[in-house]
């Protein structure tokens, strides 16, 4: 069963870049909007312990953990200690320009689609459970990008952007 499901999703998510030349031509002509110097510096400013602490306080509880087994409740209980540890980790990531291998790990589970026969592979969707430290870093970056998203994304394409 595991092989069948694995093969099914590998096929669905396979790299299907058949026409790279056409894509390159499009990208050469495309002139995306740019952020100004101040906006760029704001995105790239050092991560603060306050950003980390606020995110830990607001972590959802009663959610399944990633491969490391640490829950939102764990992060909240040890918030002060973990804020310092995460700040050092995130600083090291920026300094070395490299994510730890654990940031690429996820526990993948199948969630049956509602009112469908769960025994059929196409009626299940994969869900990746990531480690909380990776999710915290992702959320810090998402919060920063969100401040400038309306300038970067064309107004016709903002259907799933909050506040648009």
Describe the function of each predicted region.
Residues 1-122, 128, 132-136:
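Surface-exposed loop/turn segments and immediately adjacent short secondary-structure elements
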Residues 141:
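Active/ligand-binding-proximal structured segments within catalytic/core domains
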Residues 126, 159:
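Short aromatic/hydrophobic contact patches that present stacked aromatics
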Residues 144-158:
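Active-site palm subdomain of RNA-directed nucleic acid polymerases
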């Amino acid at each position: 069963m595991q092989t069948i499901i694995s093969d099914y999703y590998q096929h669905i998510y396979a790299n299907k870049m058949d026409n790279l030349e056409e894509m390159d031509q499009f990208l050469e002509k495309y002139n995306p909007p740019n952020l100004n110097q101040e906006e760029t510096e704001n995105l790239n400013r050092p991560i603060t312990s306050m950003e980390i602490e606020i995110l830990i306080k607001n972590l959802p509880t009663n959610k399944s953990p990633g491969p490391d087994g640490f829950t939102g409740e764990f992060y909240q209980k040890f918030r002060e200690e973990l804020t310092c540890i995460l700040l050092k980790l995130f600083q090291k990531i920026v300094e070395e320009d490299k994510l730890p291998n654990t940031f690429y790990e996820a526990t993948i589970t199948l969630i049956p689609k509602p009112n469908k026969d769960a025994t059929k592979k196409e009626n299940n969707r994969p869900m990746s459970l990531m480690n909380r430290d990776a999710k915290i870093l992702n959320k810090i970056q998402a919060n920063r990008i969100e401040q400038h998203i309306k300038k970067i994304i064309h107004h016709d394409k903002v259907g799933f952007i909050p506040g648009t």
